[in-house]
């Protein structure tokens, strides 16, 4: 979510420009926290039965990403713990994943996601250590 929308619930890809100045159409239908495209969002709603899910609701976006990550693990055999390859599959789609090596920009983004993931893992481990160490302290 940090990489895709920077936690902006109304995030959309920037418009393309006609003649370098006139705002034109957007390059995709991605929208919301998860930047899910319409077709994949509809597939998520149908498969999960979550018909009222919206791309602007944080809870739904997080659930969507979990659903997508789970499907990526089963379809492409990419571990849920592999943030780099999971992000490549998320950004490029299940069909486009195989061609990611031709896209240096996406590889750079995936490296940033992997770095952020490692930071979150470290923070979580530090929290767990502190909570386990001070479990009998009353606030």
Q: Where in the sequence are the language-model features?
A:
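Short helix-coil transition/hinge motifs at the ends and kinks of transmembrane helices
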Residues: 19-20, 50
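Low-complexity, Gly/Ser/Thr/Pro-rich intrinsically disordered linker/tail segments
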Residues: 133-139
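Alpha-helical segment that forms one wall of the substrate-binding/catalytic cleft
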Residues: 33-85, 89-97, 117
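Catalytic and substrate-binding regions of cell-wall glycan-acting enzymes that process beta-1,4-linked
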Residues: 22-26, 81-133
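Divalent-cation-assisted or electrostatically stabilized phosphate/pyrophosphate-binding catalytic cores
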Residues: 29
């Amino acid at each position: 979510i940090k990489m895709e929308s920077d936690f902006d619930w109304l995030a959309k890809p920037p418009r393309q420009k006609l003649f370098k100045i006139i705002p034109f159409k957007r390059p995709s239908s991605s929208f919301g926290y998860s930047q899910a495209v319409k077709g994949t969002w509809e597939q998520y709603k149908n498969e999960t039965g979550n018909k009222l899910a919206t791309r602007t609701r944080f809870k739904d976006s997080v659930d969507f990403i979990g659903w997508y990550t789970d499907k990526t693990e089963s379809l492409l055999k990419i571990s849920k713990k592999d943030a780099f390859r999971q992000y490549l599959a998320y950004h490029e789609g299940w069909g486009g994943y195989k061609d990611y090596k031709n896209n240096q920009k996406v590889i750079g983004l995936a490296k940033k996601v992997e770095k952020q993931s490692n930071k979150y893992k470290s923070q979580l481990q530090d929290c767990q250590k502190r909570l386990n160490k001070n479990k009998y302290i009353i606030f």
